[in-house]
């Protein structure tokens, strides 16, 4: 079937607009973030070097691979999370029975092996390795390191939280999170994935993702707040960052994510932070399921994919629920106020209407 010339012209204009937006706005955002990352990592590496001197079990895994840092996540242009991978999970079993949405526990495989664990003093009487106890010890060490390190005049611990958070030069926030890497494992709470009726991702990619596994993070879990407090302290938060990044390879998926993050930072950085970059990434993964064929991720389709994601976002905000991609029982809007979600819904709808009705909208956005 021949495509009318006017449709080709509209499509060409949109591709030009998208490419120009990437060259201008997206690249400017990336350049600024790259510069900030260099500064952040210099400070954090120095702090972690001091921590390691005091406690050799906390070895920094923040290494520079040609400008990329393993375990560093950009939350926003001024907020970052750095994962510190801990050693030796050996004598502990991973237990995911579904009672803690988005979380799991690490339990001694045999009570007699308690003394064999590298983390023996953080194991509870019931045999669980307590995420909160490890984080509390790490927090104390980081606070001491901040006072001793070379950047002590520009880095401060953020108080009133059980998280390990630093403020650098008053404007940048960095959370440092202890974690275990769980390679070759796949949690029961994500066992439904991939959905059998959807031909995406390719079985080879699924196999790679499941072999690579996931991470268990020592951080507060909003889903558990107000529940059994003892279990809440012992539980580890499941994270699938590597899996998500692998799934978004190919076609224009990564470019879509960069555009979505840029639009989010410029227009949806709202009170209460209802729309995070992670929510954009999650909705992009759902869009990949809705459009499983590679031809649907050609640059000609990029405008349609981005509009589809914004329409999904409006629907989620109106329903006040955004399920985690791998753990659908976990709601990413948990803890957000209805007012913040309502306000975000109106703002996203305004933005989406502009994008659907004005082919040159990216010049102003």
UniProtKB/Swiss-Prot annotation:
InterPro entries reported for this sequence: Mab-21-like_nuc_Trfase, Mab-21_HhH/H2TH-like, MAB21L/cGLR
Subcellular location: Nucleus
Keyword annotations: Nucleus
GO cellular component assignments: nucleus
Name of a matching Pfam family: Mab-21_C
Domain of life: Eukaryota
Keyword Phosphoprotein: no
Family, as annotated: Belongs to the mab-21 family.
Full protein name: Protein mab-21
Source organism of this protein record: Aedes aegypti (Yellowfever mosquito)
């Amino acid at each position: 079937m021949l495509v009318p010339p006017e449709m080709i012209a509209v499509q060409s204009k949109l591709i030009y607009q998208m490419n120009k937006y990437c060259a201008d706005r997206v690249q400017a955002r990336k350049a600024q973030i790259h510069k900030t990352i260099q500064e952040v990592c210099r400070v954090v590496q120095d702090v972690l070097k001091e921590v390691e001197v005091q406690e050799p079990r906390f070895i920094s895994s923040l290494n520079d691979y040609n400008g990329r840092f393993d375990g560093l996540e950009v939350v926003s242009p001024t907020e970052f999370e750095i994962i510190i991978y801990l050693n030796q999970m050996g004598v502990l079993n991973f237990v995911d029975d579904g009672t803690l949405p988005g979380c799991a526990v690490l339990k001694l495989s045999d009570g007699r092996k308690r003394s064999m664990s590298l983390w023996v003093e953080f194991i509870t009487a019931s045999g669980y390795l307590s995420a909160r106890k490890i984080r509390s010890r790490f927090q104390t060490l980081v606070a001491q390191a901040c006072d001793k390190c070379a950047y002590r005049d520009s880095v401060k611990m953020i108080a009133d939280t059980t998280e390990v958070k630093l403020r650098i030069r008053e404007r940048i926030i960095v959370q440092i999170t202890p974690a275990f890497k769980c390679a070759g494992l796949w949690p029961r709470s994500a066992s439904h994935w991939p959905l059998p009726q959807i031909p995406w991702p390719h079985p080879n990619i699924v196999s790679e993702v499941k072999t690579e596994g996931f991470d268990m993070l020592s951080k507060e879990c909003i889903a558990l707040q107000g529940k059994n407090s003892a279990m809440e302290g012992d539980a580890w938060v499941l994270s699938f960052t590597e899996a998500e990044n692998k799934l978004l390879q190919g076609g224009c998926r990564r470019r879509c994510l960069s555009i979505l993050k840029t639009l989010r930072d410029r227009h949806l950085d709202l009170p209460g932070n209802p729309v995070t970059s992670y929510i954009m990434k999650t909705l992009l993964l759902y869009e990949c399921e809705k459009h499983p064929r590679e031809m649907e991720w050609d640059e000609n389709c990029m405008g349609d994919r981005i509009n589809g994601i914004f329409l999904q976002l409006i629907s989620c905000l109106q329903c006040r629920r955004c399920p985690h991609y791998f753990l659908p029982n976990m709601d990413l809007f948990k803890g957000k106020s209805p007012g913040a979600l309502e306000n975000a819904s109106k703002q996203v709808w305004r933005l989406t209407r502009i994008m659907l009705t004005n082919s040159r909208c990216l010049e102003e956005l």
